[in-house]
Swiss-Prot record:
PANTHER family the UniProt entry points to: NADH DEHYDROGENASE [UBIQUINONE] IRON-SULFUR PROTEIN 2, MITOCHONDRIAL, NADH-UBIQUINONE OXIDOREDUCTASE 49 KDA SUBUNIT
Cellular component terms per the entry's GO annotation: chloroplast thylakoid membrane
Subcellular localization(s) per the UniProt record: Plastid, Chloroplast thylakoid membrane
Source organism (scientific name): Staurastrum punctulatum
Protein name (Swiss-Prot/TrEMBL): NAD(P)H-quinone oxidoreductase subunit H, chloroplastic
Catalytic reactions on record: a plastoquinone + NADH + (n+1) H(+)(in) = a plastoquinol + NAD(+) + n H(+)(out); a plastoquinone + NADPH + (n+1) H(+)(in) = a plastoquinol + NADP(+) + n H(+)(out)
Swiss-Prot/TrEMBL keywords: Chloroplast, Membrane, NAD, NADP, Plastid, Plastoquinone, Quinone, Thylakoid, Translocase, Transport
Reported function: NDH shuttles electrons from NAD(P)H:plastoquinone, via FMN and iron-sulfur (Fe-S) centers, to quinones in the photosynthetic chain and possibly in a chloroplast respiratory chain. The immediate electron acceptor for the enzyme in this species is believed to be plastoquinone. Couples the redox reaction to proton translocation, and thus conserves the redox energy in a proton gradient.
EC code(s) of this entry: 7.1.1.-
Keyword NAD in annotation: yes
InterPro entries listed in its UniProt record: NADH_Q_OxRdtase_suD, NADH_UbQ_OxRdtase_49kDa_CS, NDH1_su_D/H, NiFe-Hase_large
Signal peptide: none
Length: 395
């Protein structure tokens, strides 16, 4: 452990795992010289539940309810990457309507996640008002989720080849009304926060990460884009139907806590624009595809409906859908960064390996370096700007 030189005997303080601003069961062993942080050691694992091992003896449909417990504030993204992996592996086509519904749900989930980042982050640095404001909008998003999926959180809505149920009657109009209501609220947050002199004193120049440093540490999401890297998997990987909408990648060059705040505020605007475009141009047709065509078989490119190799995916968890003997890495742009799954099929109904790449775990690695030399009060600002959820960090 490298430590800065100190004037006096250092004091070692344990923050967490139940400190109110620790954002979950994270423990920081902080070495202090007065109010200056000499060193910090994060202790993880308090929320480890063996999610990767559980996946190895569950079918994909049986595993779907588990994945919503990784990042429990952005559950649509964990579901999306969980169904995208077998879809890519078995070459399953997703109907256009299902793809649009997925994009709408993903962006609503991004809004809910960013809102619940903004409130506690502001509370961490001493501003209580936004903490109460964000729940007003978040409640409306959860009402939309509840009417479409039946659940406010842990939706269990995505399925291999589409979604579980179609959007209910009147849902599109209700969601458009929410978008019209929400855009002025983002302006209200900005008027309240962005140019506030006390807020700027707390975040400007704090927790600086340079461009090369961010790339070398493997950061992703707003952490990477706030350091001057225009990298968004929705533009890079062209998954779902994001290419059909007009939107911009939000990024900043400063690399401090203020830049990370501005990126997330900008992303809320862009997400609302994507939702509005998707709702206005959503096509008709089926919302699911229950056909699985096997690929990679000797002598066949893809199985036809009357071939022996043709497979039907049941809506219930059943052993009819086998994962081909291949491996694949699938990723989505979650609110916190790149959420990826490395899936190895073994010609079995169970995956041979299900490796999770959580964004929070990777982004948290840089925390000790950011905290060395700062004041004790800045720990909460820097940790809050990273935006971690311990469910996905510990898995």
């Amino acid at each position: 452990m490298t430590m800065l030189k100190t004037k006096a005997d250092p004091m070692i303080v344990s923050m967490g795992p139940h400190h109110p601003s620790m954002h979950g069961v994270l423990r920081l062993i902080v070495t202090l010289d007065g109010e200056n942080v000499i060193d910090c050691e994060p202790i993880l694992g308090y929320l480890h539940r063996g999610m990767e091992k559980i996946a190895e003896n569950r079918t994909t449909l049986q595993y779907l309810p588990y994945v919503t417990r990784w990042d429990y504030l952005a559950t649509m993204f964990t579901e999306a990457v969980t169904v995208n992996a077998p879809e890519r592996l078995a070459n399953i086509q997703v109907p256009k309507r299902a793809s649009y519904i997925r994009v709408i749900m993903l962006e609503l989930s991004r809004l809910a996640s960013h809102l619940l980042w903004l409130g506690p982050f502001m509370a961490d640095i001493g501003a209580q008002t936004p903490f109460f404001y964000i729940f007003r909008e978040r409640e409306m998003i959860y009402d939309l989720f509840e009417s479409a999926t039946g659940m406010r959180m842990m939706h269990n809505y995505f399925r291999i080849g589409g979604v579980a149920v179609d959007l209910p009657y009147g849902w599109v109009d209700k969601c458009l009304d929410f978008c019209d209501y929400f855009l002025p609220k983002i302006d209200e947050y900005e008027r309240l926060i962005t140019r506030n002199p006390i807020f700027l004193k707390r975040v400007e120049g704090v927790g600086f990460i340079g461009r090369e440093e961010a790339i070398n540490w493997g950061l992703s999401g707003p952490m990477l884009r706030a350091s001057g890297v225009q990298w968004d998997l929705r533009k890079v990987d062209h998954y779902e139907c994001y290419d059909e909408f007009d939107w911009q990648v939000e990024w900043q060059t400063e690399g401090d806590c203020l830049a990370r705040y501005l990126v997330r505020i900008g992303e809320m605007r862009e997400s609302t624009k994507i939702i509005q475009q998707a709702l206005k141009s959503i096509p008709g047709g089926p919302y699911e595809n229950l056909e699985a065509r096997r690929i990679g078989l000797i002598g066949t490119d893809s199985a036809q409906w009357n071939d022996f190799e043709y497979q039907f995916i049941s809506k219930k968890p059943s052993p009819t859908f086998k994962l081909p003997k291949q491996e694949h890495y699938v990723r989505v742009e979650a609110p916190k960064g790149e959420l990826g799954i490395y899936l190895i099929g073994d010609d079995s109904i169970f995956p041979w390996r299900w490796k999770i790449r959580p964004p929070g775990f990777i982004n948290l690695q840089i925390l000790p370096q950011l905290l060395r030399g700062v004041k004790l009060a800045d720990i909460m600002t820097i940790l809050g700007s990273i935006d971690i959820i311990m469910g996905e960090v510990d898995r």
